[in-house]
Amino acid sequence: MRVCAKWVLLSRWLVLTYVLMVCCKLMSASSQHLRGHAGHHLIKPGTCEVVAVHRCCNKNRIEERSQTVKCSCFPGQVAGTTRAQPSCVEAAIVIEKWWCHMNPCLEGEDCKVLPDSSGWSCSSGNKVKTTKVTR
């Protein structure tokens, strides 16, 4: 009788453990479905988000910033900048390098395309922010 009671207790623990494992797997799978695939993050269509930011100063004590952006743009759009924030812009703006047409500067700043068309500068008073486009 004693051996039988131990087996019943052990089998109950095994069943309980199995049920908990199945529940955990189901919860993990459902939360992964809400987030997207493992390691991926879904972005609302037509928007961008910053995924990494880098800051440093060069030897002339000029602060240099760069950022990595992930976008989910509609057809005919590509990653760009509007009001100093990452955004989806018309592809023609980037293809033709009409940088100031995407309104990259903040309100009150003047936009000028760099002489070599590699980017733009936003200026206000004696403050100038230069952006060079890299791919």
From Swiss-Prot:
One of its GO terms (molecular function) is receptor ligand activity. Keywords: Secreted, Signal. Pfam families: TAFA (PF12020). Residues 1-31 form the signal peptide. It is found in: Secreted. Disruption phenotype: Mutant mice exhibit enhanced mechanical and chemical hypersensitivity following inflammation and nerve injury. Disulfide bonds: none annotated. The keyword Transmembrane does not apply. The keyword Ribonucleoprotein does not apply. GO terms for cellular component: extracellular space; glutamatergic synapse; synaptic vesicle membrane. Expressed in a descrete subset of dorsal root ganglia neurons called C-low-threshold mechanoreceptors (at protein level). Expressed in LPS-stimulated monocytes and macrophages, especially in polarized M1. InterPro entries: Chemokine-like_TAFA (IPR020350), TAFA_chemokine-like (IPR051743). Transmembrane segments: none annotated. GO terms for biological process: macrophage chemotaxis; phagocytosis; regulation of membrane potential; regulation of sensory perception of pain; regulation of signaling receptor activity; superoxide anion generation. Induction: Up-regulated in LPS-stimulated monocytes and macrophages, especially in polarized M1. PANTHER family: CHEMOKINE-LIKE PROTEIN TAFA FAMILY MEMBER, CHEMOKINE-LIKE PROTEIN TAFA-4. Belongs to the TAFA family. Modulates injury-induced and chemical pain hypersensitivity. Ligand of FPR1, can chemoattract macrophages, promote phagocytosis and increase ROS release. This is Chemokine-like protein TAFA-4. It comes from Mus musculus (Mouse).
